[in-house]
């Protein structure tokens, strides 16, 4: 609406308000009185709104007239302007309008006297307007900005530009807020954009990060089509941070995800709360040069994710075989951290998978002395091997020098076969018995220890039972003989069982000691 129509409407509303006031004075019915009061209030509000609209239009007309006629003397009577007619009855809005017009005329008077200053101010205003336009153009733009974490890694995240700033070295930069924060330090502060944050630089949330314009990359939309069941992703938690997770189920646009962290529960999310992981595989990159450069940049930032086709370091022995003698906590921790059995550690799975043999070195010796001892042992082993070959010759020569008679000849002929057979049989049985003892001590050492512990526990229980029976006999002394006889019978039986258990314990201990002694004598 224009100024004239608003002025006419304002007069009409005022006339209606006067009629309502007259009616309110004459009406006595409470129902009509309530309706008229509500109408009176509505008309007052409508008049206030119309006056404010009329005042704003008058201000705009005044400013446009000043811009269109800069040579107009501002000290003249403003009422002489044809487009600005002021009503005869001045209200509060009219007074405000008059004050505004006078202030504009006072501020604009120096401009007519000095043209050079006006041109300079116009030039500066134009530059400021251009800068504001550029800032408006960049503000709200979505880009891919770098993020330097506290532990020194460089990651590229999707972000939004909130303003242009200058870097410390004078280079052009922008302030960005990250759209998918993966850490608390990246999460935008909810009070920063409103200017109500009281912590400033000490805020634990992000007030935006200033990055160089040259480091920005084109924005990439999240491709939800690549997400499937059992594929990794980034999912938004209740705290607004995006955590790594894995999709377990997809049903009618809802994704059931299980977070990698054990502290976070499984949740069902919509498509806007889930994105593919930032560390995409190399196969997803297209053949265009720009995307290849982006892929190369991402590969330089992140470690490669090894696929199934990359062959790891082969292991000649069974991996983790040594854990048969332990609880296997090492492999469990490695599996929790994503390790795959049979592959080495490292970027290309080139790590060692063969276990390192433990070498026990003598105490109190330096490494040089240990190396000398090992070399002596090697040299001594060779020397012993040579001397052992020479020993039979010396024994043969010594045996040949002994004098022999007819009886030795006969004994050798008649008893030689029998004695040789007996000695061979005894040697075999001895070896067999020794092996059985060794194997038994090796395989059943734990079983023997368990059996000894069980027997000792039974002995303690039987001893407690005997103590209770003795106390019962002491209490029943001098009473009925039947109860005393039964207690004595039970006590004697318990003592026999205790003796048998003690004998069994001693035999088990002897077997255990025998196995330990045999092991000490056979293993060097």
UniProtKB/Swiss-Prot annotation:
Keywords: DNA-binding, Metal-binding, Nucleus, Repressor, Transcription, Transcription regulation, Zinc, Zinc-finger
Annotated protein name in UniProt: Zinc finger CCCH-type with G patch domain-containing protein
UniProt biased composition (Basic residues): 376-393
Disulfide feature: none
Biased composition (Polar residues): 106-122
SMART domains per record: G_patch, ZnF_C3H1
Superkingdom of source: Eukaryota
UniProt cross-references to InterPro entries, sorted A to Z: G_patch_dom, Znf_CCCH, Znf_CCCH_sf
Known function: Transcription repressor that specifically binds the 5'-GGAG[GA]A[GA]A-3' consensus sequence. Represses transcription by recruiting the chromatin multiprotein complex NuRD to target promoters. Negatively regulates expression of EGFR, a gene involved in cell proliferation, survival and migration.
